[in-house]
């Protein structure tokens, strides 16, 4: 894995290699005010097939998910790894520092490699990895204790959802709201938006009319916002 920091002008101002046990498939990452959080999930290419030009993934349920906390301008020797329950995280929501803990929120897939019927069509085989209901993707929180090295983790909600966005002004800081997609059952489509309060656990749904679909949303704050949630989607 390669970790770096890019300046506002697009220049690479810091770089360090991050050794891993083998090829991995990190899709996203998150950060706090002082740290970046890397991930090593146990869903990755079958190495024996790569040489044959076949790119097939396998989920290793007996391996932990590892989250690596690195100071923003740290190096390999500064990374602190935490072992967590096995999953694959496609997208992270946010992260922040709270006392001795790094709080990390993302979407935990309870079944990263869903099964398929022997007579399934090619379309069905492909879409099982795009069906959020098959993947059982839910908002989830990890608390990484930098002092003790322990982890506390668990779901923030039982709702199946993904592709969350926050008010960008709260990135890396303690926050309250995330706006996620309402997925369609059985295929890759979004039928609305879920507004989730990560402090109280409450949710509000906005569903689109039948036959209308959306992409992940973007939050645009007002020019003089009165609160984190004061803006537009």
Task: Name every feature range the model reports, one short phrase each.
Residues 1-233:
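Beta-propeller domains
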């Amino acid at each position: 894995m390669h970790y770096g920091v890019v300046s506002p002008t697009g220049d690479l101002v810091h770089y360090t290699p991050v050794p891993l046990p083998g090829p991995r498939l990190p899709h996203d990452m998150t950060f706090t005010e002082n740290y970046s959080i890397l991930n090593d999930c146990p869903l990755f290419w079958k190495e024996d097939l790569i040489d044959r030009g076949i790119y097939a993934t396998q989920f290793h349920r007996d391996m932990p998910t590892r989250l690596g906390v690195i100071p923003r301008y740290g190096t390999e020797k500064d990374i602190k790894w935490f072992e967590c329950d096995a999953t694959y995280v496609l997208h992270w929501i946010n992260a922040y520092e709270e006392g001795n803990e790094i709080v990390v929120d993302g979407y935990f897939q309870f079944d990263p490699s869903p099964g398929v019927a022997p007579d399934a069509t090619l379309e069905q085989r492909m879409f099982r990895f795009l069906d959020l209901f098959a993947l059982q993707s839910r908002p989830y929180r990890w608390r990484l204790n930098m002092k003790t090295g322990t982890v506390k983790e668990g779901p923030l909600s039982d709702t199946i959802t993904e592709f969350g966005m926050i008010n960008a002004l709260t990135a890396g800081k303690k926050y309250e709201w995330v706006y996620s997609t309402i997925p369609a059952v059985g295929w890759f489509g979004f039928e609305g938006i879920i507004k989730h309060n990560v402090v109280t656990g409450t949710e509000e749904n906005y569903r689109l009319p039948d036959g209308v679909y959306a992409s992940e949303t973007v939050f645009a704050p007002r020019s003089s916002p009165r609160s984190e949630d004061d803006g537009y989607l």
